[in-house]
Amino acid sequence: MSGVNNTSANELSTTMSNSNSAVGAPSVKTEHGDSKNSLNLDANEPPIDLPQKPLSAYTTVAILCLMIAFGGFIFGWDTGTISGFVNLSDFIRRFGQKNDKGTYYLSKVRMGLIVSIFNIGCAIGGIVLSKVGDIYGRRIGLITVTAIYVVGILIQITSINKWYQYFIGRIISGLGVGGIAVLSPMLISEVAPKHIRGTLVQLYQLMGTMGIFLGYCTNYGTKNYHNATQWRVGLGLCFAWATFMVSGMMFVPESPRYLIEVGKDEEAKRSLSKSNKVSVDDPALLVEYDTIKAGIELEKLAGNASWSELLSTKTKVFQRVLMGVMIQSLQQLTGDNYFFYYGTTIFKSVGLKDSFQTSIIIGVVNFFSSFIAVYTIERFGRRTCLLWGAASMLCCFAVFASVGVTKLWPQGSSHQDITSQGAGNCMIVFTMFFIFSFATTWAGGCYVIVSETFPLRVKSRGMAIATAANWMWGFLISFFTPFITGAINFYYGYVFLGCLVFAYFYVFFFVPETKGLTLEEVNTMWLEGVPAWKSASWVPPERRTADYDADAIDHDNRPIYKRFFSS
């Protein structure tokens, strides 16, 4: 989509939605060349493309994206520390209640609110604060939301014995993390070379798992103290993480798409040059620049974006919003936060004396599995990873729930004190299998897909809505889990199993493959209405050669079982 013509934006969208629109596409005059077909070059001459280089050539951009992805560490750190805070004696004494025996405890309501209200803050922050990135740029946006996060941490760490002060602090820090969760993957997706975009966006999840792991380790290291050191060390380190995040923003390039949108074309070229390790005058870079600029100019024809545009079905934006909301919701409904938020509590119930150690093991498996995900997301594609991930996780939950129900809860709530080391060990093993499956597929894959899906004019809004759905389900799961497990205990696992079955079929029918495509090509694929299960075979119009069969994606002769277990 490297140009615009004199038709309206809606007319052009309709033209492009025809799957055979490669012929007769609009022509344009680009900034660096003569008039040419915007959707298809000469059938016998492949377009100039930025070359795929050895991974070693992308070291610089990988480091820069790692700095941006550090926002994931901040979120992971909160997840890892809060799961232990609610089991630390000083935290319970300060923010809990006394029972008739004079013992302090955290009620299910208070525990649920303290843990889960953070997600509400994140949902609001993602929707409201992501707009800062559209107005002032992604980098300034990330600095701003990180500053808001620091304010929330300051309120929490100064709490003495008022649980509602700590509660308010978590809401405010959640506002900041919600903004980070939208802007960080967004900026990475916009500066990363298309050949490794999925890998670099996956770094956000990798940093998140590192934060969870180190948060677990910090709780384990401070649990033997008998004062506020138990939990204030974990909170105090948040200031260091925020400082690192802000400092990193001084070195990373601004989004070339944002720069073009605000008329800073030369800066945009320098950003592309820095990301792709080529000269500013490289012909392939200039073609990439023209493609991005033309796509932005096309979007500008429709005027300023509004929230109501998210409901547009003609431009397939509503379909993308729905897909983003569903995929982010289903990520929570895999049941991952059942273990991450309440892992320490869960493994107490299976008879472990030091359940903090098991949480550290979860953190280790989660962290190192994420390194595998950095490779698999680009090697096998987004859809294949999600399909195999859902299938493997539902198998893990089937074993986890069945062992828990039959060995540790055979008589229901009337026998809650049953423990079994064998059953407990089995459940821990399959928990680790689950964490491995989640970390290598759904954990980062959802953020990759959502960051690649929306056209630039509504990208921040679309990503904010999709991410807000993730936070809202995170709130519901983290708040109601203590009540649900109190009523049905390990039967809860069957609920997540059912959600994973649904997730598998949803991905197969509604989530397209975006591996190897530029963001503009992803937009074209959506406009052409390519069925998700055929998207892996789709070729962008400008890359189609004379022997390309436009009807090929309409026919799939593979056996049904092969269709369901591949992209």
UniProtKB/Swiss-Prot annotation:
Organism superkingdom: Eukaryota
Main location: membrane
Ranges that cross the membrane: 57-77, 113-133, 140-160, 171-191, 198-218, 233-253, 337-353, 360-377, 385-405, 430-450, 468-488, 490-510
InterPro entries membership: MFS_dom, MFS_sugar_transport-like, MFS_Sugar_Transporters, MFS_trans_sf, Sugar/inositol_transpt, Sugar_transporter_CS
Annotated NCBIfam families: SP
Biased composition (Polar residues): 1-22
Record function comment: Probable glucose transporter.
Record's keyword terms, sorted: Glycoprotein, Membrane, Repeat, Sugar transport, Transmembrane, Transmembrane helix, Transport
Stretches in topological domain Cytoplasmic: 1-56, 134-139, 192-197, 254-336, 378-384, 451-467, 511-567
SUPFAM superfamilies membership: MFS general substrate transporter (SSF103473)
UniProt-recorded name of the protein: Hexose transporter HXT11
Listed GO MF terms: carbohydrate:proton symporter activity; D-glucose transmembrane transporter activity; fructose transmembrane transporter activity; galactose transmembrane transporter activity; mannose transmembrane transporter activity
Annotated organism of origin: Saccharomyces cerevisiae (strain ATCC 204508 / S288c)
Stretches the record annotates as Disordered: 1-45
Assigned protein family: Belongs to the major facilitator superfamily. Sugar transporter (TC 2.A.1.1) family.
Residues exposed to the Extracellular side: 78-112, 161-170, 219-232, 354-359, 406-429, 489
GO cellular component: cell periphery; plasma membrane
Sites carrying sugar chains: N87, N227
Subcellular location: Membrane
Biological-process GO terms, alphabetical: carbohydrate transport; hexose transmembrane transport; xylitol transmembrane transport
Membrane topology label: Multi-pass membrane protein
